[in-house]
Design a protein with these regions (language model features):
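Hydrophobic alpha-helical structural elements of bacterial secretion/transport assemblies
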Residues: 47, 51, 55-87, 104-112, ...
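Terminal intrinsically disordered/low-complexity segments used for targeting and assembly
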Residues: 2-56, 111, 135, 219-265, ...
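Residues on the lipid-exposed face of transmembrane beta-strands in outer-membrane beta-barrel proteins
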Residues: 92, 115-119, 323-327
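Gram-negative outer-membrane beta-barrel proteins
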Residues: 94-100, 123-125, 305-309
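Short strand-turn segments of transmembrane beta-barrel domains in outer membranes
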Residues: 90-92, 300
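Long hydrophobic segments that form regular secondary structure
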Residues: 272-292
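Short, contiguous acidic/charged loop-to-helix segments that flank catalytic cores in large enzymes
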Residues: 308-316, 328-330
Length: 330
């Protein structure tokens, strides 16, 4: 009965018009929330090793995982009031009753060993809605970690391919420079033998200079991509080993796909936005339930005795039950 009574709206996912079918590349299908099978797409062993290091050491991803652990703890805390709490207490006290207040002027000892039970009757769904919001926040944190992982994999791959491209361009430029140096020497020899004028020699020098001036720019670009890649890996700046050219890199022939509705569910930004709506919807229920009286059932049961040696005797049994009502006024 209590489980079915909770004020506030229940979340309902809006209907979306989606096609029934969509092209799927065999062997690369994904399930909802599963980390993409990136090794099936990025097959370069060097790139795979970099991605694994990034997934382990990236600082932004580590922060997202910390927020996930925080959300897990918050859900545990939010669910705790849904169940009775049971504690054990033992103690003793000595009291002197004044004759001026009707006492007998004697000292009295009392020893107790009690079990303490407390349970809030969640009639209006205050605690259930709060746990519902915490569960949505936890799932949102899980999808945020997933989003960081997917984004990190893509960023590492992009930086790696940029680095491969720059290295390939630098290698090609160095070859071009070497070729033009040879061409300049030939032109100089031809000029010395009177076969050509100095104009052709000057043109060869200009051509060589144009090739040589590209090298510092390419080296600077390589340094930028290396530092960018190291930052993604959570490491200090240093050189990065890559494949020599794109011809050495094996690529997959297709990309993961699926039903359009599944694709939406796998998009972290869409899932995080929806879960934010779920949490906000549950918080509406929390706010509404907080307007109603809150009932708490408490009880104490155990033994009490004036003599410590008699504390566990059956005649010392004692209990008390209390129903408390609290009504917010403002």
């Amino acid at each position: 009965l209590l489980a079915g009574c909770a004020v506030g709206p229940d979340y309902e996912r809006p209907d979306l018009a989606m096609p029934d079918t969509h092209r799927v590349e065999p062997g690369l299908e994904l399930t909802t929330g599963e980390l993409p099978k990136w090794k099936a797409v990025f097959r370069d062993p060097l790139l795979q090793a970099l991605i694994e290091r990034g997934l382990e050491n990236n600082l932004d991803l580590a922060a997202a995982r910390s927020r996930l652990r925080e959300a897990e703890a918050e859900l545990t805390r939010a669910r705790a009031p849904l169940y009775p709490s049971l504690d054990v207490a033992a103690g003793g006290e000595r009291e002197y009753e004044s004759e001026l207040t009707g006492g007998d002027g004697e000292t009295a000892d009392t020893y107790s060993f009690l079990g303490l039970l407390s349970w809030e009757l969640d009639i209006w769904g205050f605690n259930r809605r709060r746990a519902e919001a915490a569960a949505a926040d936890l799932e949102s944190a899980q999808w945020s970690v997933y989003a960081r992982q997917v984004s990190l994999i893509g960023a590492i791959a992009a930086s790696y391919f940029n680095l491969v491209a720059v290295n390939e361009q630098l290698s090609l430029t160095n070859s071009t420079v070497a070729t033009r140096i040879q061409a300049l020497r030939i032109q100089e020899l031809r000029n010395q033998s009177g076969m050509i004028s100095g104009l052709e020699v000057a043109q060869a020098k200009v051509s060589l200079a144009e090739a040589e001036k590209q090298i510092p720019t390419l080296k600077n670009s390589r340094l930028v991509f290396e530092n960018q890649l190291r930052r993604l890996l959570g490491e200090m700046p240093a050189s990065v080993n890559t494949s020599r050219s794109f011809e050495d890199i094996p690529f997959a022939t297709g990309l993961p796909a699926g039903l359009p509705s599944d694709l939406l569910e796998r998009r972290p930004d869409v899932r995080v936005a929806e879960l934010g709506l779920v949490a906000a919807n549950a918080e509406v229920g929390v706010a509404k339930a907080d307007l109603f009286p809150r009932l708490t059932l408490t009880g104490e049961f155990g033994t009490e005795s004036a003599d410590l040696s008699d504390l566990l005797d059956s005649g010392g049994r004692a209990w008390v039950a209390t129903l408390g009502v609290a009504q917010p006024l403002f």
